[in-house]
Amino acid sequence: MKLQYLVALLSVQAVPPVTAGYIHQYALVGSVIRQPIDQKTQRENLNKLVSDSPLLSLHRTICEIESVSNREGAVGEVLLKYLRDRGFTVEKQIVPADRGTNSTAERFNIWAYPKGCPRPKIILTSHIDTVPPHIKYSLHAPDGDFDRAKVRIMGRGTVDAKASVAAQIIAALKHLKSNKDIPLGLLFVVSEEVGGSGMVHFSNSELNTNPPFFHTLIFGEPTDLTLVDGHKGNLRVTIEAKGVAAHSGYPWLGRSAISEILPILARMDELGDIPVETGGLPSSEKYGRTTVNIGTIKGGAADNVVPETASASIAVRLAAGTPEEAEEIIRRAVHDVSGGSTNITVNFPDSMPYPPIDLDVDVEGFDISTVNYGTDIPKLEIHDEELEVKVKRYLYGPGTIFVAHGAEEGITVGDLEKAVEGYSKLIDAAVKRGWPREVVVN
């Protein structure tokens, strides 16, 4: 009786669903779940899932290659070959190493377009550099019942922004397969994470014509699959203080640079929280308040020495106004706190600060969001001043910015695959729109 009861029980045992031939943790025989599968088998199943998908395998290939800013050459070469093998004409745009780096390796932007279409009307663009350190690519099955869409891909760049790079390429290939005459271009740039010299290089090149030959730009960054209607502006600030060194036992013989800079930094820290009328930085309904982040503070030589120097670097995310207006507010605040001391110096080292950037969101089928982070978008100067219809700029991509740059950077298979659909919608809208009239490009 006991044996019969056991057989009857097993015959009605509920079994977790199996998706795409894979199952997490358990081996399935008939309708009976037996012992957990070993890690080797699970790893093989996950690797097969990736290998069977052109999107996932491309994403894995480029994420496995370290491409920290100023060391993007290796991943660039892989993408060059990948695109050429699939019929694109591909050009290198050599970009010099950023100032202050020791890198001598070649690195470059990638400019790709279908054969016979050197001036595509629609450009998909993202960046191939990442922040340090490189974190190894890895695959992780979901807890509980297996769901293919919930498989998690971890590692540096899996979100920011190689997810966008892979999804944009696959979306472009799918469109060109159905219609080889679609005027699609791909631009993948270097150094987005450290100042944007890659996009600046493209912007200053002969490819950025006046007026532009393109009518649509689709930028790829982690946006949680939302279409972004704008992002905050950016301004960098450095403040330096000079003191006089002395023995800490006789501090009146010197002057502390740290003591001079501290009240100024306290004032800077609150500029985003107080009204413009009382000396604060502006806010807006769309972007909220301007935020001030004191990122680094340096000063002094030892605890028994009155510090001779002190400095701080600050990032300001502008919610309203112009960088020039923000600079004036900051100078005034520093002057008020320091009493106009000549021992305090304020500098704005970014050669290309920018105000809040408004973007296009006129394509149906997307949730809309606003983001606080910066992008390459303001680094590309678009010469459409004389055009009746301006160039469209869209910002969209898979993954969340909340894990980008962190130790837990990662994305799900489902989000990566949905991004291909999202980019396809944006491409379709751009193809349908086209130029309202012919534009002569010099």
Curated annotation (Swiss-Prot):
Pfam families to which the protein is assigned, alphabetical: M20_dimer, Peptidase_M20
InterPro entries in the record: Bact_exopeptidase_dim_dom, Peptidase_M20, Peptidase_M20_dimer, Peptidase_M20A
Keywords in alphabetical order: Glycoprotein, Hydrolase, Metal-binding, Protease, Secreted, Signal, Zinc
Cofactor note: Binds 2 Zn(2+) ions per subunit.
EC number(s) stated in the UniProt entry for this protein: 3.4.17.-
Sugar attachment sites: 102, 343
Enzyme active site: 192
Signal peptide per UniProt: 1-20
Cofactor(s) essential for the protein: Zn(2+)
Binding site for Zn(2+) 2: 160
Cell compartments where the protein resides: Secreted
GO biological process: proteolysis
Binding site for Zn(2+) 1: 160, 193
Keyword flag Metal-binding: yes
Coiled coil start-end: none
Keyword Nucleotide-binding: no
GO molecular function: metal ion binding; peptidase activity
GO cellular component: extracellular region
PANTHER family, per database record: ACETYLORNITHINE DEACETYLASE (PTHR43808), PEPTIDASE M20 DIMERISATION DOMAIN-CONTAINING PROTEIN (PTHR43808:SF8)
The name this protein goes by in its record: Probable carboxypeptidase PADG_04062
